[in-house]
Regions:
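N-terminal low-hydrophobic presequence detector
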Residues: 52, 158-161, 264
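Betabetaalpha-Me/HNH-type nuclease active-site subdomain
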Residues: 92-228, 235-237, 255
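A cross-family structural signal marking well-folded subdomains
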Residues: 1-138
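A sequence-composition feature that detects small, non-aromatic residues
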Residues: 9-14, 29, 46-47, 67, ...
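Generic hydrophobic alpha-helical scaffold/packing signal
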Residues: 45, 60, 64, 163-166, ...
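C-terminal, well-folded lobe of enzymatic/effector domains
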Residues: 54-63, 68-72, 76-83, 109-115, ...
Length: 264
């Protein structure tokens, strides 16, 4: 079945996730669902029908990276993106594109360059009170964790959750002397202030002072969290949050990257 419009592709999305793909392809497709990105549906369904399974799997991984940079972090126009995807889908359907190498040059316009991606991500905040955003943050941190330690965490596992290092509801101002009102809303929801922690540890440390929290971080099995105890054990402040955000973004630039599309 060929989809002739993005609207049809959106309507076809349950089959897109549940029946078309399996294994790693299904995992990548579900990541697009997590991103709430629908613009590449028509392209992916055309590619699944016409390209080799190997080329399709490669394309799907590339689309996930493009979507993370373009849609999730930079939040750029979906209309422009949709037009490009639809043009490529038509070329695949008409037989003008028959393999991934012919397709790649057409995706370059949608691949956000490292500097723009980095600069935007450095200033990004994530309101983790929103359930979908919270899940997105878990995806980002678990992906970075896998790259750092090799631990592949199940995204929906109840055994761990998101820890706000500077708490959402800090108890005493004396426990967090580096934070003033101007910083609170910004600092709390920056990725640099968020980390992974077991559900048990997170519950037990609650809104404790950083001097108490860091002792728990030091024993944590997650590298992304142990890093805090190893590098920022003296204090926690807005400046340090920015420093850690810089570290996490640097990792992200390497992880969500397509070398064939990167231009020097």
């Amino acid at each position: 079945m060929w989809l002739t419009s993005p609207q049809q592709a959106v309507g076809f999305s349950p089959l897109f996730y549940n029946s078309y793909f399996d294994g790693n392809d299904q995992k990548q497709a579900c990541t697009l669902r997590l991103f709430n990105v629908t613009t590449p549906y028509s392209l992916l369904l055309a590619a699944q029908s016409k390209l080799s399974s190997k080329d399709f799997s490669t394309l799907l991984k590339i689309i996930v990276v493009i979507s993370f940079r373009y849609n999730v972090i930079c939040e750029l126009s979906c209309l422009d993106q949709e037009k490009i995807y639809n043009k490529i889908a038509l070329k695949i359907t008409n037989g003008e594109i028959t393999n991934i190498q012919e397709l790649l040059p057409l995706l370059k316009k949608l691949y956000i360059k490292d500097k723009i991606f980095r600069d935007t991500f450095e200033n990004k905040t994530f309101n983790t009170n929103d359930r979908k955003v919270n899940r997105l943050v878990k995806y980002i941190l678990t992906t970075i964790e896998k790259d750092l330690s090799g631990i592949d965490l199940a995204l929906d596992s109840p055994d761990y959750n998101i820890e706000h290092i500077y708490p959402q509801n800090p108890g005493s101002d004396e426990d967090w002397p580096e934070f003033i009102d101007d910083y609170i809303n910004i600092s709390t929801y920056k990725l640099g202030n968020l980390t992974l922690l077991s559900e048990k540890d997170n519950r037990e440390i609650g809104n404790e002072a950083f001097s108490q929290k860091v002792k728990v971080y030091a024993k944590c099995k997650f590298e992304v969290t142990k890093y805090i105890a190893e590098h920022y054990f003296v204090e926690w402040s807005p400046a340090i949050i920015c420093s850690r955000q810089h570290f996490l973004v640097s990792e992200a630039v390497k992880i969500w990257k397509v070398s064939q599309l990167a231009t020097k």
